[in-house]
Regions:
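Catalytic pocket-lining loop regions of alpha/beta-barrel enzymes
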Residues: 138-139, 153-268, 296-299, 304, ...
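Mid-to-C-terminal alpha-helical segments outside catalytic/metal-binding sites
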Residues: 1-15, 22-69, 77, 130, ...
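Active-site environment of divalent metal-dependent phosphoester hydrolases
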Residues: 18-23, 85-88, 118-120, 146-149, ...
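Histidine-centered catalytic micro-motifs
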Residues: 12-22, 176-180, 211
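Divalent metal-coordination and catalytic microenvironments
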Residues: 16, 69, 78, 112, ...
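Alpha-helical scaffolding within the catalytic cores
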Residues: 60-67, 94-100, 124-128, 194-197, ...
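Active-site gating/metal-coordination segments in enzymes
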Residues: 77-191
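Short aromatic-enriched loop/helix-cap "lid" or pocket-rim segments at secondary-structure transitions
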Residues: 23-29, 92, 125, 152-154, ...
Length: 345
């Protein structure tokens, strides 16, 4: 929890964290190298004291995450929202097994989402059903610009995507996290276009579409979609990290989101290990909108910040907002054997 200067406790859910492997050993081709190096360039938007050496950034440890998220980062609950990138990395950029093992170490503080790719068609649907039965996923992370063979991306409105979305809903997955934000080299910017969210949100109103990175650089497109679709949410990861190097720009982003969506549909995420939650949360809690922006959209308040930092995501995932959780508390779940083999990809 974050404690304000007045002593008030703020419950924090980091809705977008990663354990990735961008090591030289795991890189399959030049595209994998380009991807992790582009990630590292984004990482350098951090305050200097939070910038890691490149080799550590390529593959950090479970202990790094525990320290940066739970011990130092004010986070009470964290949610893995990974990407696979099987065409770039031998064993995937993110590992289901590694994420699940970490979740089992901290079952009262971690939710591990996974992914699906509609280009896997029927085989992927069967894999989804098996995995939901085994792992009980509450959400998925979709990466519409991911390369697969000759394909350089897909759309939420593709026929197979609709089948996956409908099956997800039938299986009890309600939270659909979609990367609709800045492009990472070598992926294509247009494949992350936010426009396809509009139709699926209208036709599948019982699903929650969390648009990660709030559609940047297409913020206006996103806000006008979200204004008319009550099941569309803004994920602040990436955008909120601009609070350090581009505070005015971030103030413009958050003021637009508050005006069009309201504070109940904005969700905090650090995108760790792109950035660490500690400095982001500290700067966000100190944020006051410039007078000219506040005159149009209103000032951001403590109650709004409480909703954004934890209460909104807790509501979507049925997380109890209560007393602070202490790092290293007893595990309440017996370990299970991990699934062998790679996902369908």
């Amino acid at each position: 929890m974050f404690t304000t200067k007045s002593g008030e406790k703020i419950f924090v859910v980091d809705g977008h964290v990663h354990l990735w492997d961008g090591s030289d050993k795991n890189i399959k081709n030049r595209y994998g190298e380009e991807f992790i190096k582009c990630f590292y360039d984004y990482h350098k938007l951090s305050p200097k004291e939070y910038v890691w050496p490149y080799k550590k950034y390529q593959k950090y440890t479970d202990e790094d995450l525990e320290q940066d998220i739970f011990q130092n980062g004010y986070v009470d609950f964290a949610i893995f929202n990974p990407q696979y990138l099987g065409d770039f990395y031998h064993h995937g950029f993110s590992s289901l097994e590694r994420n699940e093992a970490f979740r089992k170490k901290h079952p009262d503080r971690v939710i591990a989402n996974w992914f699906w790719d509609p280009r896997n068609e029927e085989a992927g649907l069967k894999q989804l059903e098996q995995d939901v039965e085994k792992y009980g996923w509450k959400g998925v992370k979709l990466y519409t610009a991911e390369w697969k063979g000759d394909s350089k991306g897909w759309k939420l409105t593709d026929p197979w995507s609709y089948r996956y979305l409908q099956r997800s809903q039938e299986l009890g997955i309600k939270n659909i996290h979609v990367h609709k934000g800045p492009t990472i080299r070598p992926l294509n910017k247009d494949a992350f276009d936010v426009g396809d969210v509009d139709e699926v949100a209208s036709l599948l109103p019982d699903l929650n579409f969390i648009v990660e990175h709030c559609g940047l650089p297409r913020l206006n497109d996103f806000t006008f979609i979200a204004a008319q679709e009550p099941n569309v949410y803004a994920g602040l990861s990436v955008a909120i990290a601009l609070i350090h190097t581009r505070p005015r720009y971030f103030s413009e982003i958050i003021s637009e989101l508050l005006f069009w969506l309201g504070p109940e549909r904005i969700l905090f995420g650090s995108d760790y290990a792109l950035w660490q939650p500690k400095w982001i949360i500290e700067k966000f809690m100190d944020l006051e909108l410039p007078e000219d922006l506040a005159a149009e959209t209103g000032q951001i308040t403590l109650e709004m910040k409480k909703k954004i930092l934890g209460e909104n995501t807790a509501r979507l995932y049925n997380i109890s907002v209560g007393e602070p959780k202490h790092f290293g508390s007893a595990v309440s779940e017996a370990p299970e054997p991990l699934r062998k083999g790679a996902p369908v990809a």
